[in-house]
């Protein structure tokens, strides 16, 4: 059975991804930060599945990432964890950087140290393109992997 770890499982995309992977027969480890409030409202389907395990963890904790990846030995790791409010990124740029940029690096450093490396997916936002857009031959606007980055906030980095 394939095993996947989802950082940021309590967000909208994380909850949808956990349901999808469970439907595909995966064992899913959903990682959520410790919180003073119950942040599992988006997980009613996943929480009732025997192949889903909710794990407390944080992308800013390299030792915790190492322990989890070493014990689970996942086939896939998804990083959807983020400080996802643009305005908050201006108010707390260091915290945003620690979660969005260093958090990704922390996961990648652990993966790099593993003998059998899982596939890795890093979620992002169109905010990284800022006001850069490309146009197709019909004049329609789009952004893709060739669009130049032009972040306008700490969140977008």
Over which residues does each language-model region extend?
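N-terminal Rossmann-like NAD(P)+-binding domain of SDR-like oxidoreductases, especially those catalyzing
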Residues: 1-157
